Amino acid sequence: MMKFKWIIFSFLAVVFFISAGSTILQTKPQNQDPGVGPVKNVVLGPIDNQKVADGKKIYLAKCVVCHDLNTKKIGPPLKNIAKERMPEYIMNLLVNAVQMQKQDPFVKDLLKKYNNVLMPDPAISQTQARTVLEYLRSVAK
């Protein structure tokens, strides 16, 4: 009888940890808002190291003045943005910064927190925005 109880207990423990792990391992961001802009659907696969390298170059050239990965600067830190927002949202913010700042409620709230300092339009293409997204995905791990 004691052996049977241990088998049942072990089985239930395994089921519990598997179900708990499945929510822990989810990669979808909590917020499912795609933002305002032309990017409607981004299909993510494994991290592409070439895109990461290209995206890092763009980040260092156009973003790092205002955004650090870990600390607040003129704008918010970006290390976990790929975990917190949809890929479409991030790309739309990069390719459609002006409209996002005018229309998106989350960005409007951020502006208030950061002294209403507007993000300049980075003037990058969707292809370039995709590489920046890939870089941000790589640092969010």
Language model features with spans:
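Gly/Gly-Pro-rich "capping" loops immediately C-terminal to redox-active cysteine motifs
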Residues: 52, 56, 68-99, 116, ...
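Electrostatic cytochrome c docking/interface patches
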Residues: 28-58
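C-terminal capping alpha-helices of c-type cytochrome domains
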Residues: 6, 11-14, 23, 89-93, ...
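Short cysteine clusters
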Residues: 63-66
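Proline-centered turn/helix-capping motifs that create local helix->coil transitions or kinks
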Residues: 99-105
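Bacterial Sec-dependent signal peptides at the C-terminal "C-region" and cleavage site
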Residues: 18-30
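Short, internal strand/loop/helix patches
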Residues: 107-115
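N-terminal secretory signal peptides that target proteins for export/translocation
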Residues: 1-2
